[in-house]
């Protein structure tokens, strides 16, 4: 009879969790940032607030965003005017949208990841579904499983209402699942729809308007597993370590509350300062065992909460301008998609590395870091190792 130690050893994978495929998706409705202030104040019937509109225009100009994608169209907003009020009773309307749209958009990204992976979907053993856009039972994980036609016995995990750091959370969870379940293939999906938080402007809550200037819709998907079969699977990144921490003296810096008026966000002005002040500690904890202390020797995948966060992190660490290029490109092309952002940046990183003729998926470097920042203030840190590119 086998001992419990032998059973546990047999259940564990030999190698590290590895990202094997990436897929992304957005709604078809593109919003161009240069036009957005006029559009936003028109659809919310707020054009009489001329001074506030100019403040919002400056927010959009400083956002470093060129384009975002949104499920909400002008037609949908005309049919649901309660979404356009600042604090209109609207949760039922919002929930009816996101309960169906979150898994639908997630499916689009997942189908692309599964196609790139190239294996039958019956080989998926676990599903991690993540969204900050609404809640429901059975959850978006169940709906995604049904939409994709996955096995009824697939093991599901649902993460609701975690916020912008959750792209790191799902990687940390996927790492543990892949490394502790031999042969596991984990489908990870982050899907976000801003219908849960869209609202009209008010002078009384400029932090709410910052969110209106930044947030966009998108879904990202990964296939994660250990010990890849190199005859049929193509590794992209390995995960060496993952951790989470609460930053000191940061309570209330980022809050989100799901209420009858939808999801409201509240931000303190010093969020970039709090993050930049503490980021060195997070890096040292993650990389001192590896022997890396020059942060320019890493490839970078950082959640783009906004340009001020990126600017202060860059300055604090003395990063070269190109270090955050992939992050800034995603912010520019898609806006802040909450949990899905870092999955888009992973996709941008491997594609850019291939386009540029780099020797690895991490811009020619071996080691990289993925950061998620969000409510708490919570920081997720994932240590990544690139794989060689046959250019």
Swiss-Prot record:
The keyword Glycoprotein does not apply. It catalyses: (E)-4-coumaroyl-CoA + 3 malonyl-CoA + 3 H(+) = 2',4,4',6'-tetrahydroxychalcone + 3 CO2 + 4 CoA. It holds the Pfam family Chal_sti_synt_C. GO terms for biological process: flavonoid biosynthetic process; polyketide biosynthetic process. Its EC number is 2.3.1.74. One of its GO terms (molecular function) is naringenin-chalcone synthase activity. The active site is at 164. PROSITE patterns: CHALCONE_SYNTH. It is an enzyme of class 2 (transferase). Gene3D superfamilies: 3.40.47.10. Keywords: Acyltransferase, Flavonoid biosynthesis, Transferase. The keyword Acyltransferase applies. Pathway: Secondary metabolite biosynthesis; flavonoid biosynthesis. Belongs to the thiolase-like superfamily. Chalcone/stilbene synthases family. PANTHER family: CHALCONE SYNTHASE (PTHR11877:SF14), HYDROXYMETHYLGLUTARYL-COA SYNTHASE (PTHR11877). The primary product of this enzyme is 4,2',4',6'-tetrahydroxychalcone (also termed naringenin-chalcone or chalcone) which can under specific conditions spontaneously isomerize into naringenin. This is Chalcone synthase.
């Amino acid at each position: 009879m086998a001992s419990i130690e032998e059973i546990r050893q047999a259940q564990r994978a030999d190698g590290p969790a590895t990202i094997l495929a990436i897929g992304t998706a957005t709604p078809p409705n593109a919003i161009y940032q240069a036009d957005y202030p006029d559009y936003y104040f028109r659809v919310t019937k707020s054009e009489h607030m001329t001074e506030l509109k100019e403040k919002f225009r400056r927010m959009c100009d400083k956002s470093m965003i060129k384009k975002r994608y949104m499920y909400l169209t002008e037609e949908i907003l005309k049919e649901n005017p309660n979404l356009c009020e600042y604090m209109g009773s609207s949760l039922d309307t919002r929930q009816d949208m996101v309960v169906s749209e979150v898994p639908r958009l997630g499916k689009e990204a997942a189908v692309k990841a599964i196609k790139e992976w190239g294996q039958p979907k019956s080989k998926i053993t676990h599903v991690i579904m993540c969204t900050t856009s609404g809640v429901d039972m059975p959850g978006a994980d169940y709906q995604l499983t049904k939409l994709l036609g996955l096995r009824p016995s697939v093991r599901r995990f649902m993460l609701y209402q975690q916020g912008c750091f959750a792209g790191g959370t799902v990687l940390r969870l996927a790492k543990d699942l892949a490394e502790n379940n031999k042969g596991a293939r984990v489908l990870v999906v982050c899907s976000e729809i801003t219908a849960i938080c869209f609202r009209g402007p008010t002078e009384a809550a400029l932090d709410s308007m910052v969110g209106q200037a930044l947030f966009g819709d998108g879904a990202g998907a990964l296939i994660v597993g250990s010990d890849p079969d190199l005859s049929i699977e193509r590794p992209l990144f390995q995960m060496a370590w993952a951790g989470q921490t609460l930053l000191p003296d940061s309570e209330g810096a980022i809050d989100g509350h799901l209420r009858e008026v939808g999801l409201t966000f509240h931000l303190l002005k010093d969020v970039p300062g709090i993050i930049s002040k503490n980021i060195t500690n997070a890096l040292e904890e993650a990389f001192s065992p590896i022997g890396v202390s020059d942060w320019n020797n890493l490839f970078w995948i950082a959640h783009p909460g906004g340009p001020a966060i990126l600017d202060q992190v860059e300055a604090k660490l003395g990063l070269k301008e190109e270090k955050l290029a992939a992050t800034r490109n995603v912010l520019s092309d898609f806006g802040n998609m909450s949990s899905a952002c870092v999955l888009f940046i992973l996709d941008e990183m491997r594609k850019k590395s291939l386009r540029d003729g780099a020797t690895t998926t991490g811009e020619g470097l071996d080691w990289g870091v993925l950061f998620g920042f969000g409510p708490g203030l919570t920081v997720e840190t994932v240590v990544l190792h690139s794989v060689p590119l046959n250019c």
